[in-house]
């Protein structure tokens, strides 16, 4: 019996033994080592050691591995209606033989999980666009963040795009409406961001360049270009300088007005990269709620 899994961006750079425990169950290290050595567990059809790190787009094959089916299926599968499929297909910016690019809506996850049901992977898995294949998630975009998002159509494209993101050859531009004013209109943030993995504290370097596009005494419109790709990087960095993003319910001050807007005012505005000497540039139009808050706060976006 063979069972295959596609590694999504959530587990990028995670050791294979930890991936197994996270996705298949809390197996003893000895059993995992034995299964890897015997070839019952392979990555991209190759035997690997337990220290091998998986990458987004990798295919993990289990051959007669005694996994617990109930644990494997802990992620809730979302079955979209035809209306939901059509709504998301209408958000597509580009559709070619290797990948699609869409303007993701706020409030929808990239992939399913124990906390998320409605997600893009399950939606497009049932779209005619992926009739002869399946969607591959190649990078992260928070559930509440809108904007440019890419999904590969086949394994080779997934591996290529993932490597471009990992090698920082994809140039991303984000827009955010944040509270208050920054000290400098142009600059770079270099921070040590802390996250926790199974109660273990992990500190990671985070770099972002930024430019203030417009501001007043109450709020600012910021353009940000992350150099590193840490979880919640932009949200954490703006919070750290005292200017949390409007609508951020996690990184905020206690006196933040919840009634101002329920949407996170963070938008993946543009992505640029090169494939075989061809330049790809994709821009996602601002959501209506973002433009509405700009108008309410009397902020001007140069391209709007």
Predicted features by range, described:
Residues 210:
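Long C-terminal interaction/binding lobes of large macromolecular proteins
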Residues 1-188, 192-198, 204, 215, ...:
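RNA pseudouridine synthases
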Residues 116-124, 155, 218-273:
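Pseudouridine synthase
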Residues 47, 231, 279-281:
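Short, solvent-exposed loop/turn motifs
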Residues 279-304:
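Short hairpin/turn module used for nucleic-acid contact or packing/dimerization
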Residues 198-206, 250-253:
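PP2C/PPM family metal-dependent serine/threonine protein phosphatase catalytic domain
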């Amino acid at each position: 019996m063979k069972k295959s899994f596609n590694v999504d961006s959530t587990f990028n750079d995670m050791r294979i033994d930890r991936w197994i425990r996270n996705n298949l169950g809390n197996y003893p290290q000895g059993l995992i080592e034995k299964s890897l050595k015997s070839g019952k567990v392979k990555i991209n059809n190759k035997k690997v050691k337990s220290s091998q790190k998986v990458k987004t787009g990798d295919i993990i094959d289990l051959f007669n591995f005694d996994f617990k089916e109930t644990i494997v299926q802990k992620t809730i599968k979302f079955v979209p209606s035809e209306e939901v499929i059509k709504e998301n297909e209408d958000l597509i910016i580009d559709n070619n033989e290797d990948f699609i690019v869409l303007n993701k809506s706020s409030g929808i996850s990239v992939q399913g999980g124990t906390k998320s049901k409605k997600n893009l992977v399950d939606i497009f898995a049932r779209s005619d666009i992926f009739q002869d294949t399946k969607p591959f998630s190649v990078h992260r975009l928070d559930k509440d963040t809108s904007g440019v998002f890419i999904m590969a159509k086949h394994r080779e494209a997934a591996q290529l795009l993932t490597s471009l993101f990992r090698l920082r050859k994809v140039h991303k531009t984000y827009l955010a409406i944040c509270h208050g004013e920054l000290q400098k209109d142009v600059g770079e943030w270099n921070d040590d961001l802390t996250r926790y993995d199974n109660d273990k504290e992990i500190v990671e370097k985070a770099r972002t360049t930024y430019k203030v596009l417009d501001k007043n005494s109450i709020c600012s419109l910021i353009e940000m270009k992350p150099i590193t790709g840490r979880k919640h990087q932009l949200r954490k960095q703006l919070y750290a300088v005292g200017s949390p993003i409007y609508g951020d319910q996690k990184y905020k001050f206690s006196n933040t007005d919840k009634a101002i807007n329920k949407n996170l005012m963070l938008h993946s505005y543009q992505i640029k990269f090169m494939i075989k000497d061809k330049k790809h540039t994709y821009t996602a139009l601002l959501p209506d709620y973002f433009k509405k808050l700009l108008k309410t706060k009397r902020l001007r976006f140069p391209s709007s």
